[in-house]
């Protein structure tokens, strides 16, 4: 593997000195870019794009050609793991992801097999190794997975949900059944993420997109408990370097202290959290990633600049901050505005690292 030329992102996650605040964007390879749309059209559909290692590599690299980013993130989907368990993932226009065979009974959950990441998920591993090779050491590669709770919401509900009625019913009516599913998913995610590291991922992120839908105590029981299990089981060193781990619970501002106790290296923040307050609460233990509202990118470059300045000022001096959005970039954002955001981080952040 080529030697890493820009390790700013990895250093910030480990709270080591940096010359400026590193920046990347969740969903930076995505529908806001015309070149992504062209590649997706070439693939035919979303999952065909994910499963073609050369096209997945191409869309991963596209934002890096446009912008001076400090990290690349694997182009894939969080639902690859349940798909590999045989649930029959498909996408309906306007409806999002759906499963042909939901796992909403104890019998269906008992039948689930933990997928071999080099077999059923081999296409992801081939994409990871291809991307790592093609990056040529320019920036580190982030691997990722959904959290067990978030994956389970799709598996039990049969797809996206606004109310999570089925899985919450299971949580309170048949908690042992849900724990069986979450435990299988945690084991699957550990294997999946460790295989990503073995194939070239240099940092890992766990997306708990729907943890914020849980009550205070239910979050610890059904989400955090299983992210803790994953953190405990991950490969934390590869290629002579530490492999940092970031946990991100959307709507998780209540639980930052508990999340920081897992032993992860960093926490992702959504835009509802004041990053300065988060630093005072947990900055002695973990780095922080975030957290500009993605909708700010609809604003003028001047307003984007102001928002970046405000977040940098709130975090304050020193390392331990990776600038990002508070969630994925919206598909209708002007790519030029994304460029303004990244340039503003570069321009304004150096003064905080003297």
Curated annotation (Swiss-Prot):
* Catalytic reactions of this protein: uroporphyrinogen III + 4 H(+) = coproporphyrinogen III + 4 CO2
Q: What are the recorded GO MF terms, alphabetically?
A: uroporphyrinogen decarboxylase activity
Q: What SUPFAM superfamilies is this protein classified in?
A: UROD/MetE-like
Against Gene3D superfamilies, the record matches this protein to:
3.20.20.210
Annotated EC: 4.1.1.37
* Pathway(s) of this molecule: Porphyrin-containing compound metabolism; protoporphyrin-IX biosynthesis; coproporphyrinogen-III from 5-aminolevulinate: step 4/4
Q: Chief localization class?
A: cytoplasm
> Which GO CC annotations does the UniProt entry carry?
cytosol
Q: Where in the cell is it found?
A: Cytoplasm
Q: Which residues carry the site feature described as Transition state stabilizer?
A: 77
Which residues are listed for substrate binding in this entry?
Answer: 27-31, 77, 154, 209, 327
Task: Give the record's keywords alphabetically.
Answer: Cytoplasm, Decarboxylase, Lyase, Porphyrin biosynthesis
Q: Where along the sequence do coiled-coil regions lie?
A: none
User: Could you tell me the Gene Ontology terms of the biological process aspect for this record?
Assistant: protoporphyrinogen IX biosynthetic process from glutamate
Task: Name the family.
Answer: Belongs to the uroporphyrinogen decarboxylase family.
**Quaternary structure note:** Homodimer.
What function does the entry list? Catalyzes the decarboxylation of four acetate groups of uroporphyrinogen-III to yield coproporphyrinogen-III.
This chain's protein is named Uroporphyrinogen decarboxylase
Per the record, the gene is hemE
């Amino acid at each position: 593997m080529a030697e890493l030329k820009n390790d700013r992102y990895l250093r910030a996650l480990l709270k080591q000195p940096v010359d400026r605040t590193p920046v990347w964007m969740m969903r930076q390879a995505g529908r806001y870019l015309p070149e992504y749309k062209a590649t997706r059209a070439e693939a035919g559909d979303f999952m065909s794009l994910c499963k073609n290692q050369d096209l997945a590599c191409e869309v991963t690299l596209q934002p890096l050609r446009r912008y001076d980013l400090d990290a690349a993130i694997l182009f894939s989907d969080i639902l690859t793991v349940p798909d590999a368990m045989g649930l029959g993932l498909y996408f309906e226009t306007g409806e999002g992801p759906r499963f042909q065979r939901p796992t909403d009974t104890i019998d269906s959950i008992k039948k689930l097999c933990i997928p071999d990441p080099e077999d059923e998920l081999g296409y992801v591993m081939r994409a990871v190794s291809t991307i790592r090779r093609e990056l040529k050491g320019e920036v580190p590669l982030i691997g990722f997975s959904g959290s067990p709770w978030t994956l389970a919401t799709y598996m039990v509900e049969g797809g996206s949900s606004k109310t999570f009625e089925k899985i919450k019913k299971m949580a309170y009516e048949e908690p042992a059944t849900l724990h069986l599913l979450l435990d299988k998913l945690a084991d699957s995610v550990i294997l999946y993420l460790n295989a990503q590291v073995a194939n070239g991922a240099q940092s890992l992120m766990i997306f708990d997109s729907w943890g914020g839908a849980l009550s205070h105590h239910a979050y610890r029981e059904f989400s955090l408990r299983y992210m803790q299990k994953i953190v405990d089981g991950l490969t934390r060193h590869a290629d002579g370097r530490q492999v940092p781990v970031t946990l991100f619970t959307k709507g998780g501002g209540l639980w930052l202290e508990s999340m920081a106790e897992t032993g992860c290296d960093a926490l992702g923040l959504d835009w509802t959290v004041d990053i300065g307050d988060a630093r005072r609460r947990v900055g002695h233990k973990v780095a922080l990633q975030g957290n500009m509202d993605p909708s700010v990118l609809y604003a003028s470059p001047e307003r984007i600049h102001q928002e970046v300045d405000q977040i940098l000022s709130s975090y304050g001096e020193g390392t331990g901050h990776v600038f990002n959005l508070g969630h994925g970039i919206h598909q209708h954002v002007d790519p030029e505005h994304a460029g303004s955001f990244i340039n503003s981080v570069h321009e304004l952040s150096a003064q905080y690292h003297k």
